[in-house]
Amino acid sequence: MSSKAQSKEKFKSKIGGQAVIEGVMMRGIDKAAMACRLPDGTIDLEEWAIKGGKDTPWYRKTPFVRGIFSFLTSLIDGYKCLTRSAEKQMTEDDEEEQTKFEQWLDDKLGDKLGPIITAISMVLGVGLAILLFMYLPSLVSKFISKFVHLSAFGKNLIEGILKIAIFIGYTALTALTKDIRRTYEYHGAEHKTIACYEHEEELTVENVKKYTRFHPRCGTSFIFLVLFISIFVNTIFRVSWANIFLRVVIKIALLPIVTGIAYELIRLAGKYDNIFTKIISAPGLWIQRITTSEPDESQIECAIAALKACIPENKEDDKW
């Protein structure tokens, strides 16, 4: 068999993950795990079962439909893991230093407080995303069209470029803060560890260090594709510019189509290595220069612990 053919048939894992606060979460075919570095220096490993493998429902296997549910699952589970990982960084002193208002909320709501705060935070986060990536670019593009004659595609193109610019600018600004920069280092550890596993090398710190922190099957690349594909979907469906609020509502309704297409392209990029997949992966890999950083050994150890917990008993089940 030629080296080219061998390269195409290289093992690709279904395991994916994300960086959390001082740790890494990995998700396999039937279980997930989160490994966090605690303030005392130890690694806290949390594992839980998920529906997958033979138990995977039809809507998680059907092309284009599966992307919608994978996106929603990643969004919800990812936010829960971020919240839990942040809680793990609290020390006894932090818990004792509650304000009177925090103590009152804790007394009144008890165990319900956490889910309520999570729900409110998610709603605010989604609202901010709609404002930044849907309403504002549409508003600016419509304003420009008052002075320059633009076709529908031209307005959608400007809108898309603005969305991508906001995304890159936002990630670049967040990278300036110490805490987010450390999260980006854990993001790099996640990618390097998955790459080591896919090259079927033993998962050790020294082996993981050798691999790149850039990975085609990444949330950063997925977001870029969603923003890019929306340019064409909004043009094809002739989303109205008459009312910006109505336009935003229609774009939200079209989001399942956009995410479904983006997910399938990410799957292709993760499975194959050819000129087409290199082209669709290139922008996302470039943006990963911002959203990932080189990790240290302690961060790699967390990524290894999380990934090892997700490896299925039968490795054949994990083939992409």
Spans of features found by a protein language model:
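Hydrophobic alpha-helical segments characteristic of transmembrane helices
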Residues: 95-147, 153-177
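Hydrophobic alpha-helical membrane-embedded segments
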Residues: 62-84, 159-184, 255-271
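Polar-ligand-bearing catalytic/cofactor-coordination segments
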Residues: 2-16, 20, 24-26, 40, ...
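Transmembrane alpha-helical segments and their cytosolic interface motifs
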Residues: 113-131, 211-235
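Juxtamembrane "helix exit" motif at the C-terminal ends of alpha-helical transmembrane segments
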Residues: 84-85, 125-149, 226-255, 259, ...
